[in-house]
Amino acid sequence: MIQHEEIATPIGLTARLLDVAEVFAGVGVSREETVVRPGERLPVIGVRDLQDGAVAPREALDTVGFSSLSKAMTYAVQADDVLVTGRGTLLKFGLVGDETAGAIASANIIVVRPGTDVTGGALFAILSSDVFRPKIEVLRRGATTLLSLSPKDLAKLEINLPPLNEQQRIAALVKDAQIAYRTALEAAEIRRSLARRLIDARLFGDNQNH
């Protein structure tokens, strides 16, 4: 239940994350269960599925069997959700797109679901920023390099939220930046593959397949 204890400012409002978003951890599943667990198989998001601010699409995710579909769907992510790694060596963030919506968040993932008059793109920009990231880092606990983050601790952090129209501009910039980044990566991969073929042709000629 999202509460509303906000402090209005000329540039927006200051509020705890729990006042403007729903914050919860995903469902517990082990790697072994991705193979042997019975029930209807659903795509599950793990730590490795968060890369460069994006979340892997449903078809690229491991699937896990769930005996109770209704229970599993309470952990399904929605477009515009912000995902944060709750356990792992690295603190990672991801913004859920339509291609991932409906997948199930694992227990290693914290879901931050924006409330009314809040955009996920703006929340993602705030939480993953170089300014705010250290505030989350200090909340992570662990005796080794495998650190954990509590959803309750994360939810208590205060954020400065811009007005909605500015949030929408920020969200658009985030989306454009992610599209540009993915496009650049795809183009680089194509160039590398082409260069490899040309190099192999010069080195081995027609003998490269023999």
Where are these regions (language model features)?
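A short beta-sheet element
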Residues: 86-127
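Glycine- and charge-enriched low-complexity intrinsically disordered segments
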Residues: 120-144
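Non-catalytic DNA-recognition/assembly elements of restriction-modification systems
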Residues: 1-33, 39, 161-210
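Generic structural signal for buried aliphatic residues
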Residues: 81-84
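Short, surface-exposed loop/turn microsegments at beta-strand edges and helix-strand junctions
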Residues: 34-42, 60-63, 75-77, 95-107
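Sequence-specific dsDNA recognition surfaces
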Residues: 18-33, 49-79
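A short glycine-rich beta-alpha junction/loop motif
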Residues: 103-108, 141-168
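A structural connector/turn signal
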Residues: 71-72, 99, 144
